[in-house]
Design a protein with these regions (language model features):
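Non-catalytic helical/linker scaffolds that mediate oligomerization, partner binding
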Residues: 1-470
Length: 470
């Protein structure tokens, strides 16, 4: 059973029920909606469709809303595009003008106040580069370092620079409210630079009565990397968003950053998603490149909770095949990882009772050669903490909450399973044995380790470990 989860971006390529159904069967665990594109009406149709499909299949499939985040773009040119050469002088202005070969407007009026001489501006995903040589209250005068064709509304990036624009825009607020109204499970927060960005979103979620949505912080710039500790402590998970990160940070640093973030999240018990260009060639081709296969495998070796498909499923020619391919790579890679050795050699910080019991549960499962760990968890917290230790046995996450059932689909190694309320520990143990045996197809006499709380219906009461034979 595959331990690493798969996040798939929905789009035109998978807007029909048959394709989405096949993607779920192929291994999709989380459906991602990118709110940088499409209308609320488009997203509403896709949310309704994924809910319909997951109900028919009886599968826990979480829904993730990915925000647009702070956006910096140029506006338009008189003729739609221009061509710039190295050492040309070019101006970005806060004034509203029609762009030409010498200047263009920007969408952020405060940009001239945030930049200094010597700062670098990248456009069109880093294909064009500019160095700031001077500025006024409204203009940023630059020297073209790398030229090329520049067309309307291209994105702007500022390596190693944190701008002062307000993090939570009105557009993001509208999108988040829409997501809350349509019962999304996760919000992926774009361009998180510090913990205050997350606190702003939490405050807004509280304002609209949607505090049950989990936050995934997307790390896409230098500030996000530098502040990973405080960001990790404020969110429910991290996305290593390598696309924009590779523009804002020298690309040769990305592999080390990816590994450090994944390790940090594992130590803290946070879910971590590795994203961007994992099987990019499958947008057009039925088979991935050898480098892409190794990229996916390396993320799995690192211990990522999930791997993500973007354009491959949203707009590619082979969305189902892309999911199937990613699942095959992950499954085969996991067979070659010695999880028991990793667990025994890792140094985890045990901070509370849940940590201690979760760690002991994993150790006991190894010691007695158990076939599974069964976690009874209302909120999913205990299941996530057990998952954090990456045990070598399967984890079954039993919950009475449908919301938790879907959310656990993003947790490494956890097979979510709905169960009824249990009036006593005896009934709890009976249900745990019965459901675990059924879900994992265990044999009579196989041992499982059960952990959870004695108090029924309350979160945070994890206080037991028990060994049972099915």
């Amino acid at each position: 059973m595959r331990k690493t989860k798969i996040v798939c971006t929905l789009g035109p390529a998978c807007s029909d029920k048959q394709t989405l159904t096949e993607m779920c069967k192929a291994g999709m665990n989380v459906a991602r909606l990118n709110f940088s594109h499409n209308t609320h009406a488009d997203h509403e149709k896709r949310i309704a469709l994924i809910k319909e499909v997951r109900e028919e299949l009886g599968l826990p499939i979480a829904i993730m809303l990915d925000t647009k985040g702070p956006e910096y773009r140029i506006k338009t040119f008189k003729n739609g595009k221009i061509t710039l050469k190295e050492n040309d002088v070019f101006t970005f202005t806060a004034d509203d003008i029609e762009g030409d070969e010498t200047r263009v407007s920007v969408n952020y009026k405060g940009l001239p106040h945030d930049l200094e001489k010597g700062d670098i501006i990248l456009l069109n995903n880093g294909l064009l580069s500019f160095e700031v040589t001077d500025k006024t209250d409204t203009d940023i005068i630059c020297r073209v370092k790398i030229g090329g064709e520049l067309s309307d509304r291209k994105s702007m990036s500022f390596p190693n620079k944190t701008l002062k624009q307000k993090y939570l825009s009105e557009q993001d607020k509208q999108d988040i409210k829409f997501g809350a109204e349509h019962d999304v499970d996760f919000i992926a927060c774009s361009f998180v630079s510090c913990k205050q960005d997350l606190l702003d979103i939490k405050a807004y979620l509280k304002e609209i009565g949607a505090e049950g949505i989990d936050l995934i912080a997307k790390i896409e710039n230098r500030s996000g990397v530098d502040n990973i500790e405080e960001i990790s402590n404020e969110c429910d998970g991290i996305m290593v968003a390598r696309g924009d990160m590779g523009v804002e940070i020298p690309f040769e640093e990305l592999p080390a950053i990816q590994k450090k973030i994944i390790t940090k999240c594992r130590m803290l018990g946070k879910r971590v998603i590795t994203a961007t260009e994992m099987l990019e060639s499958m947008i057009y081709n039925a088979r991935p490149t050898r480098a892409e296969i190794s990229d996916v495998a390396n993320a799995v070796y690192d211990g990522t909770s999930a791997i993500m498909l973007s354009g491959e499923t949203a707009a590619g020619k082979y969305p189902v095949q892309a999911v199937r391919t990613m699942a095959r790579i992950a499954e085969n890679t996991e067979k070659n990882i010695h999880y028991e050795k990793r667990f025994l050699s890792s140094e985890f910080k045990i901070k509370n009772t849940v940590d201690a019991i979760s760690h002991a549960t994993c150790g006991m499962a190894i010691d007695i050669d158990a076939k599974a760990i069964t976690v009874c968890s209302l909120s999913g917290m205990t299941a996530r903490m057990v998952s954090r230790f990456r045990p070598p046995v399967d984890i079954v996450g039993l919950t009475t909450s449908e919301k938790t059932w879907h959310k656990l689909s993003l947790s490494w190694g956890v097979t979510p399973q709905m169960c009824e309320n249990y009036p006593s520990t005896d009934v709890l143990f009976y249900n745990a044995q019965k459901l675990t045996k059924h879900v994992l197809k265990l044999r009579d006499g196989d041992k499982i380790v059960i952990t959870g709380g004695v108090t029924n219906g309350k979160s945070g009461n994890t206080n037991l470990i028990k060994v049972e034979r099915v």
